[in-house]
A protein has these predicted regions:
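Polybasic, glycine- and aromatic-enriched phosphate-binding surface used to engage nucleic acids
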Residues: 1-131
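Flexible helix-coil linker/hinge segments at domain or subdomain boundaries
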Residues: 134-148
Length: 148
């Protein structure tokens, strides 16, 4: 990596012009900006793990939204908990109530209600290397978000 490709660039060369396109390599939650009508959920979330790529900086493609705190990454457990919540059936139902289209823009995501910081951290404890399946996600959410 970067992979040789004649069609489209798949890496960013660090320079004064590209510096603003990059963020520190931390934990982030990524969501696709567009979903197809056939997809089970409108929002599909994943955790960016900075330990998988040895680089102090990272750039995300324009077709992704990324959750951050003041331009910096999130604590690992919070990122995992947020991704789990975004992948839940509950979040999908609420998102579809407020957004009838397949575009997932940052403004719509900001308007949504989220669990507390403590609840997100507890949710994150249930995510290891892989996101649990849908049924497990929903059970975890139901159990953990009953607690204040």
């Amino acid at each position: 990596w970067p992979a040789p490709s004649g069609k489209k660039a798949n890496a960013i060369a660090l320079s004064a012009q590209t510096q603003d396109l990059l963020v520190s390599a931390d934990y982030y939650v990524l969501t696709k900006r567009f979903s197809s009508k056939e997809e089970r959920r409108r929002v599909v979330a994943a955790v960016y793990d900075p330990h998988r790529i040895a680089s102090p900086l990272v750039g995300f493609e324009n077709h992704l939204n990324y959750f951050h705190t003041g331009g910096n990454g999130l604590p690992e457990q919070m990122a995992k908990g947020l991704a789990l919540y975004l992948n839940s059936s509950l979040f999908d139902c609420h998102f579809r109530l407020f957004s009838g289209h397949t575009q997932v823009n940052a403004t719509d995501l900001r308007k949504m209600t989220y669990p507390s910081r403590d609840q997100l951290m507890r949710l994150g404890l249930h995510v290891q290397d892989r996101m649990p399946d849908q049924e497990t996600i929903d059970k975890i959410l139901e159990r953990e978000c009953e607690k204040p």
